[in-house]
């Protein structure tokens, strides 16, 4: 979901 995308991007930082 959208939240999964956000958390995924933050995890890449």
Curated annotation (Swiss-Prot):
An annotated GO cellular component: extracellular region
Predominant location of this chain?
secreted
What tissues contain this protein? Expressed by the skin dorsal glands.
Q: Which controlled-vocabulary keywords does the entry list?
A: Amidation, Amphibian defense peptide, Secreted
Which GO terms of type biological process are on file? Answer: defense response
The places in or outside the cell where this protein is found are: Secreted
Protein name per Swiss-Prot or TrEMBL: Caeridin-7.1
């Amino acid at each position: 979901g959208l939240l999964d995308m956000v958390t995924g991007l933050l995890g890449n930082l």
